[in-house]
Regions:
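Short, charge-dense linear interaction motifs
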Residues: 1-219
């Protein structure tokens, strides 16, 4: 929300009109972040880790076959731990060891995200869990500049309005401060199957906002 102020002092040069304004641009995400985990349970921790590693290899192969370069694939966690089954009569019983490895994958071609998801699920099978897909704008430089232009235009229009209402004339800009509002983290979108059976990722829109505070001297 914008606000306006009129300030003065003994020195006429310090008299000014100050306003705040926010410019916002809506952008369609061009990239999707995929979070996935492979998990295998086996009789020994060695076998569990080997199984998870084999599943991870299938995941990487499927990603590469669908145009995902290695620098867009990052391991987030790697765990191996005993797994127990609890019953009231026997208490905790060791049933094996679970190994997991989680990944963050950047899919630069957002429109291809559903195809990538289908490919990794088919390649890895039941040892794969899809933890989430998050559409976002990979580079918001252009959108930020447009939001900045919008913010300045709104601020100037507001200051001009105050000047007209107060019967004064605007001089030069004497102060400007920008605060770039963090773009809200995109909500994780649910995956849906199309009529043809392929997974679709709904990209939605993302707001890119710039807020400014500006002062104009009173001529």
């Amino acid at each position: 929300m914008a606000a306006g102020t009129l300030a003065s002092s003994a020195n006429a040069a310090e008299r000014y009109i100050g306003v705040s304004a926010t410019g916002t641009v809506k952008v369609k995400p061009d990239t999707v972040r995929l979070n996935a985990t492979v998990a295998v349970v086996a009789g020994t921790n060695k076998d569990a880790l080997a199984g998870a590693s084999a599943s991870a290899t299938k995941l990487r192969t499927a990603l590469g076959a669908n145009g995902i370069i290695p620098s867009y694939i990052k391991s987030n966690t790697l765990t191996v731990f005993p797994e127990y089954n609890y019953t009231a009569d026997k208490g905790s019983t060791l049933v094996g060891y679970r190994a997991t490895q989680s990944f963050e994958v950047i899919i630069r071609n957002a429109s291809n995200a559903g195809t990538v998801v289908d490919a990794v699920v088919a390649a890895v099978g039941d040892s794969l869990a899809i933890d989430g897909v998050t559409p976002y704008v990979y580079d918001n430089t252009s959108a930020t500049e447009k939001a900045r232009v919008d913010a300045v235009a709104r601020a100037k229009a507001k200051a001009t309005s105050y000047a007209r209402l107060l019967g004064v004339k605007l001089g030069k800009v004497t102060y400007l401060e920008e605060s770039s509002s963090p773009s809200p983290f995109p909500i994780m979108m649910a995956m849906a199957k199309s009529d043809a059976g392929a997974t679709q990722i709904d990209l939605g829109q993302q707001d890119v906002s710039i807020s400014i505070v500006a002062r104009w001297s009173i001529a």
